[in-house]
Amino acid sequence: MNGLPRPRRSLWLGIGLGVVLVVLAAAAAVAIAGLQPADLTYTPNSESQMTNIDVSRAYAKNYYGAPTATSGAGGTWNTPLNQDSNYASEARSVAKQGDNWLSARSKVADKAIVLDVDDTTLTTWNYELYSNWDFNPTTNAQFVGLTGSTFTGNAFPATPGMVDMVSDAKAMGYAIFFLTGRGDSQHQATIANLVSDTAAGLPDLTTVTISGKTVPEIDAGYPMPTPLDIQHGGFTDGLFTKPPVGQYPAYLNKPQFCGPSITAGVSCPTIQYKSGVRAYVESQGYDIVGNFGDQFSDLLNGFADKTFKMPNPNYYLP
């Protein structure tokens, strides 16, 4: 979700057990109602109602099974994702639920799945460690695979359980579509990370170097997305990246999708953009049996038989 200016990301800050329970209950109620969860606007009355930010970071590191040493810029980001962590277990559980659902619906005609990229099919935890939860589009692009406009290798690992789930879906005859808020300029690099460098028509790299640290370059090994007619940006594969303002495709120019944003000359909000793309996919004759995302904005506004929320405590994108 990175090619265009990105909404501010924020680390979850605990604010006392009672408030946390209220917030979680409210979020669950909102999710059930199919509405966008509101931004947290509670103003603590005292320090005792907050969790220390460093403690919150430690909670996140424990959840992901990361080293406990303070990371900071470039610290322990190059440690491989812990496949035995609570995060990995929870991600695999959602992937298994998805696999079971897709298997049960395998007789559906013209069936498809739609998947977000960041923290749905690729895990960006190493960037959170690298940046100390301070998103910067330039450094983030290096993890995506770009230094300027030059492809320098991908650094994001696959989300635990998801490559197997998507591969199973492909074997069952599902069309595979990826839908991300990353910009068109990151399209090829994203294909390289999801599938392979050669699948994206890019040099087949084996390492990537960021801030002086060299790590193995990652090709996650997902199936190639299903081809569609020419989309925005001239791409014909089934990875939908977000076009620049002023270059949205005609199918998004509807009042319920990006029409108001197109008229105003501003970026289309995630919910309207992603639901508009899903509507387009279904207009091509597909039945989206499952829609997978780590943000509520990946999942809301319909055009999918069932949605699956991947775990991600690191940031919130409306």
Enumerate the language-model features and the residues they cover.
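C-terminal cap/substrate-recognition subdomain and adjoining C-terminal extension
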Residues: 9, 32-40, 187-318
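Non-catalytic pre-domain segments flanking phosphatase-related domains
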Residues: 2-115
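Structured segments of extracytoplasmic/periplasmic soluble domains
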Residues: 97, 101-105, 124, 128, ...
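A solvent-exposed, charged loop/short amphipathic helix patch at secondary-structure junctions
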Residues: 129-153
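Short, solvent-exposed loop/turn and secondary-structure capping segments
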Residues: 124-128, 132-135, 189-190, 301-304
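Structural beta-sheet core signal
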Residues: 178-180, 291
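Asp-based phosphoryl-transfer active-site loop
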Residues: 109-124, 178
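Short, acidic loop-to-helix structural element flanking the phosphoryl-transfer center
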Residues: 147-177, 184-185, 190
